[in-house]
Amino acid sequence: IIDPGGEANKIIESIAVEVVGIIITHHHFDHVGAIESIKNYYNAKVYDYGNLKEENNIGVFTFRVIPTPGHSDDSISVYFKDDNVMFVGDFVFNGSIGRTDLGGNEMDMKKSIETILSYDDSIRLYPGHYLSTTIGDERKNLEYFSKMF
């Protein structure tokens, strides 16, 4: 599970597999609200920027952690290469980027944008809110936002 923000009972009821881990892209309330309930229900370990390495295996999943501070100091993006998907929390949205005024930093955001732009355009991005997109679809937006800082 990635970023269980709330409604723990709905999350638990909708999952038909064993949960072995919970990944947090950043520690804002709307991404961590259901952690304790889900962690306790499944006896799952919680993973975040503090205890993940660059390359990770949790259960059957293999993924890369990419530090993407800017929206918050602890923001990470989680890239599943085999599936060509990246979970980006509130770092990037479809058509926009995350706010930097909630414990973030504009220069960190600029560096994080530059990091993500080094990845392949075909990677599907799943933000913490709203619709998914791809790096290619966001490239012009991200280049524009990067120049603002």
Describe the predicted segments one by one.
Residues G6-Y49:
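Active-site metal-binding motif and surrounding structural segment of the metallo-beta-lactamase
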Residues I1-V17, S77-G89:
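Conserved beta-strand hairpin/beta-sheet module of binuclear metal-dependent hydrolase folds
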Residues I2-P4, V20-H28, Y47-Y49, P67-G70, ...:
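Active-site neighborhood of phospho(di)ester-bond hydrolases with catalytic His/Asp-centered motifs
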Residues G33, F63, G103-G104:
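Residue-level signal for the nucleotide or nucleotide-sugar donor/cofactor binding architecture
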Residues E13, E36, E54-N57, S77, ...:
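Short secondary-structure boundary/capping segments
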Residues E55-F80, M86:
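Core dinuclear metal-dependent hydrolase active-site scaffold
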